[in-house]
Amino acid sequence: MQRIAIPASANAPLTTTPVKIAIRNLEFYYGTFQALKQINLEIPEKRVTALIGPSGCGKSTLLRIFNRIYALYPKLEARGEVLLDGENILSPKYSINRLRSKVGMVFQKPVPFPMTIYENVAYGIRHHEVMSKSQMNDRVEQALQQSALWEEVKDKLNQNALGLSGGQQQRLCIARAIALTPSVLLLDEPTSALDPISTSRIEQLIEELKTKYTIVIVTHNMQQAARVSDYTGFMYLGDLIEHDRTETIFSQPSKQQTEDYITGRFG
């Protein structure tokens, strides 16, 4: 796939395809508080885009708009457009169930359900699809294979998932997210609660998964963003300050705020 030329200007739209998610004039409000301000961003298909910035800058808020998780809470409002494959997912006509099957999400802390390893992976499938037992077995195995967990758990699928290590639990959460065969995978600080060895394994997994999925990751770890992402967006106080190729952001940022943040002068 041809690499996408991304301009240094935060608000300049991408002009080269393929684009998986296109954000147009996006604003977000917690009641009367404006958390995101006129965000314009294009996220390329089957690449890793990292969102960085200090706590409270809006990066996790932006990530969670991509699957409309905010709809669970009152007095939260998104304005503008978020186009997934050309369709505005913020439209009331866009089904939440359809969106959740297309966009998987993994959170900061591993949250396996208190059930077997098998049932953790099968849980979402049962709510969205009807299939035979053999088809379900194949789908569960495929998800565990893709999350690099199959060889470790194939002989204990009926054991409680809470018995897995922290790193295994997070890979199980990834398996659960991709079991529905989404096209987008959202990762909200997926390694912040893990040890260095588990973190390294998750980072290797991200590199493997981007051949199949468009990945957006929120991270406070500058080194991690530099290692795993193809593109990086720097956010500050609800604004997207700069968005470019990761190597450019970390070596030749165009905005002083970006340079100050990645060099540790603030944040």
From Swiss-Prot:
Domain ABC transporter: residue ranges: 21-262
Superkingdom of origin organism: Bacteria
Subcellular location: Cell inner membrane
Any one GO CC term of the record: plasma membrane
Sequence positions that bind ATP: G53, P54, S55, G56, C57, G58, K59, S60
Catalysis performed (reactions): phosphate(out) + ATP + H2O = ADP + 2 phosphate(in) + H(+)
PANTHER family, alphabetized: ABC TRANSPORTER I FAMILY MEMBER 17 (PTHR43423), PHOSPHATE IMPORT ATP-BINDING PROTEIN PSTB (PTHR43423:SF3)
Protein task: Part of the ABC transporter complex PstSACB involved in phosphate import. Responsible for energy coupling to the transport system.
Oligomeric form and interacting partners: The complex is composed of two ATP-binding proteins (PstB), two transmembrane proteins (PstC and PstA) and a solute-binding protein (PstS).
Protein name: Phosphate import ATP-binding protein PstB
Species of the source: Xylella fastidiosa (strain 9a5c)
Classification lineage: Bacteria, Pseudomonadati, Pseudomonadota, Gammaproteobacteria, Lysobacterales
